[in-house]
Amino acid sequence: MDWNQLRVFATVAEVGSFTGAGKVLGLSQSAVSRQISTLESDLGVMLFRRHASGIVLTEPGVELQQAVADMSSRLALATGRINEYRDTPEGPLRITTTVTFGSAWLSARMNTFLETYPDISVSLLLVDNLELDLGRGQADVAIRFTRPTQPNLVQRKLMSMHYHIFASEEYIAANGCPKTVDDLDEHRIIVYGEDVPAPVDNINWLLNVGRPEGKPRTPALRVNSVHGIYRAVLSGLGIAALPYYLSDESPKLVEILPELCGPSMDAYFVYPEEFRHSKRIEVLRDFLLDEVKAYKHIHKADAT
């Protein structure tokens, strides 16, 4: 089968008419009709039923449409992978990570990255409680906070980050600032919800720190999103443990009891083995490692 004929067929099937397909392809209606007739003759089946009101795919036509769609998808994927071997970093780059980290730490650094590599276009795919499948091409790169175990993924640790205790200036002005761990008993505590997997072990340590065993504090609010907890703290609702990098997001966020350090999480730069030689991924990895070094220099108490 001739690929040009298949391309014409796929366009006719999508548009629903020979005339419309001709406009898309820059061909006359008669040229499109001849291509389809030749293809039908070669295959020995009718691909379309012609009606006064238009054309409709036959059953063999539906089968061929799906096959051509699969071929086009595979060709596009192969072309994209071949382009990874170019020396110049260019093209689309899809990065997936959590909503909070992507909205705060990562997105704040994308301007510098894109100014350095203007031929790369970035899509940030931010999701919580779900990991996009890199092996199935749902994203090109991931920044994960659990160590990947799949053998076909390349990983590089970026850094470890700790949870610290924060409140807003507004909350402290209205309720005072805890000076000791025991003082936390007199304040509204915001914690992570129990109905979804936590992003880090012992994330609700604030309920138990300084308390007798089996007698945790009662939280004022549970939220099943770190970003939601962050917004609640900023609103002046209460005190919560948050990743330290969020302290860069708002000058109204005040660290409480800085001598207390909560659980930590490791951030990993992850991508499929087949992209090992991708220039786009290489420059992104090196850029983020440089950004991590700068972050560690500024926030020596947090990142390791």
Where are these regions (language model features)?
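A bilobed periplasmic-binding-protein/Venus flytrap-type ligand-binding module shared by bacterial periplasmic
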Residues: 267-277
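A short LG(V/I)-centered, amphipathic sequence patch enriched
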Residues: 40-57
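Short helix-boundary/capping micro-motifs
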Residues: 11-26
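Residues within the DNA-recognition helix of helix-turn-helix
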Residues: 28, 35, 109
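Short helix-loop hinge/linker segments at domain boundaries
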Residues: 52-55, 62, 73-96
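C-terminal regulatory
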Residues: 133-136, 148-268, 294-304
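Central regulatory/effector-binding core of bacterial HTH transcription factors
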Residues: 91-151, 301-304
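Conserved amphipathic alpha-helical core elements
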Residues: 39-40, 253
